[in-house]
Amino acid sequence: MTNIRKSHPLFKIINHSFIDLPTPSNISSWWNFGSLLGICLILQILTGLFLAMHYTADTSTAFSSVTHICRDVNYGWFIRYLHANGASMFFICLFIHVGRGMYYGSYAFMETWNIGIILMFTVMATAFMGYVLPWGQMSFWGATVITNLLSAIPYIGPTLVEWIWGGFSVDKATLTRFFAFHFILPFIIAALATVHLLFLHETGSNNPSGLNSDADKIPFHPYYTLKDFLGMLLLILTLISLVLFFPDLLGDPDNYMPANPLNTPPHIKPEWYFLFAYAILRSIPNKLGGVLALILSILILALLPLLHTSKQRSLMFRPITQTLYWILVADLLTLTWIGGQPVEHPFTIIGQLASILYFSIILILMPISGYIENKIIKLN
């Protein structure tokens, strides 16, 4: 009699995905972040579900309902801050996951990579709409500024913005539809993540060397289930520490003021995880140009497989491109800092230079360095 996990139609899928899955024996801790993203998503869906039980998507009561959750609901404050800071942890894991993919050449798996980019856009849209729901000052003005960017689209722009708003400004209709989308999108993300995993298991995982690892594979369970469990413990420890000791560290104080359409905050800015893209948007004086740069700052990831010039997949043995990669990381941190600063000298010029450097490294310098490294290998 065969083992039930190998014969049962449902268990067989789970077995091939998480138990008997042949995995390279040398994948490092950078490969933990995929499973951590799964944990973050489950956590966000669960905490979000409990928050939705007490939240009201109406402009007159939304802010009060969030206050009610924090003050009157049993452990409501805990659930609310788990959800808010869980989003931050989600993005930290997401950025590391994408960064790992860039470093080790995982973008060679085209289907997996492209679904990953779609996932990233979907997660960003979900987070943006979630930020609008508490209906604080930054919620309202963030929604107004970001949705207004669509008016830069030629001909249909203004009509499109009013259609999204459901009126002539961000109001009750906007809040209601944002809540509806914010509720449904995580389930779409879960479905896309399953497809992402499906395509990954068609090819098998990449590994730090970027070489073929078919000759040296080990079963996923118990080796990587245990390793993922350690990552999960560290993630939960970090998140709980953040929630219990510094719950408002990553939030904006302006969001503790109820939304007021008659009073504009001095500095309108999104959550910290969008600041790099916001800085790129602001660095271009033209509205349409800024919007295009904003979209391209993420969409540029889709070009990575086409821009790969090196004969080696990973950056493990490529010191020149390695240096460029870490300059890119530093540049993204600079953009994140600039995105949170007011639009004045010297921040404007720093933002513009950092934006130029961001696109230059990916589009020009990395392909050239790959070509140079090929030449150096030939010389040896």
From Swiss-Prot:
Disulfide bond annotation, renumbered to this chain: none
Gene3D superfamilies: Cytochrome Bc1 Complex, Chain C
Organism of provenance: Nesomys audeberti
The UniProt record lists the keyword Membrane: yes
Coiled coil in keyword set: no
GO terms (BP aspect): mitochondrial electron transport, ubiquinol to cytochrome c
Protein name, entry field: Cytochrome b
Family (UniProt): Belongs to the cytochrome b family.
Cofactor: heme b
Note on how the cofactor is bound: Binds 2 heme b groups non-covalently.
Amino acids binding a ubiquinone: 201
Cellular-component GO terms for this entry: mitochondrial inner membrane; respiratory chain complex III
